[in-house]
Swiss-Prot record:
Highest taxon above the source species: Bacteria
Protein known as: Inner membrane-spanning protein YciB
Parts of the chain that traverse the membrane: 34-54, 65-85, 88-108, 131-151, 160-180
Disulfide bonds: none
Keywords: Cell inner membrane, Cell membrane, Membrane, Transmembrane, Transmembrane helix
Bilayer disposition of the protein: Multi-pass membrane protein
């Protein structure tokens, strides 16, 4: 459910981008296309994460980072009327997540994925390390895929940002689920998990 909530601002961004081709002027700013969608992304992010914070009195670090990147890069996009700032958001966020997951091998006593999921499932330490490395690779691939599409297919990048990123995430989560199911099944049957 958390992943869906995090995608709400992006989905609204996509909808506004697709249905708002006409030229809209507001307070001296052109808010058509990418700029109207960016304003929607910023507003939706503030509302979604604000509501989550009011409900739980807590946001995860990744949510704070995503909100901050949205506000800064989206704000720069609107202020300078230059969409390049927003185009760098997805690669930068993904690469910084990769850095955080990779850094967790050296800082602290557990890999990042174990810190996130360790309360829910038990795995041997070697599997936590492999799973964490898989997340590092996933975030790196997502960042480079976004960057490639942004600068190679500029007319397609918004579609990729929504459907490509979402599709890659779903496929990765399914793969992770299958990987975990195999090892959790080993634990249930009493077999020694494959490390």
């Amino acid at each position: 459910m958390k992943q869906f909530i995090d995608f709400i601002p992006l989905i609204l961004f996509f909808i506004v981008y697709k249905i708002d081709p006409q030229n809209v002027e507001f307070a001296g700013f052109n808010l058509s296309g990418i700029y109207g969608a960016t304003a929607t992304l910023i507003l939706a992010s503030v509302i979604v994460y604000g509501a989550l914070w009011l409900k739980h009195r807590h946001l995860e670090k990744s949510q704070w980072f995503t909100l901050g990147a949205c506000l800064v890069l989206g704000g720069l996009t609107l202020a300078f009327h230059e969409d390049t700032f927003l185009k760098w958001k997805a690669p930068l966020v993904n690469w910084l997540f990769a850095l955080a997951f990779a850094g967790s091998h050296f800082i602290g006593d557990k890999p990042m994925i174990q810190r996130i999921m360790g309360h829910a499932i038990q795995l041997p330490q070697g599997l936590w390390v492999r799973l964490n490395i898989a997340w590092v690779v996933f975030f790196l691939v997502c960042g480079f895929a976004n960057l490639y599409v942004v600068f190679t297919y500029p007319n397609f990048w918004v579609d990729f940002k929504v459907f490509g990123s979402l599709g890659m995430t779903l496929l990765f989560l399914i793969g992770q689920g299958l990987f975990l199911a195999r090892h959790l099944h080993d634990a249930d049957t009493g077999e020694k998990p494959k490390d």
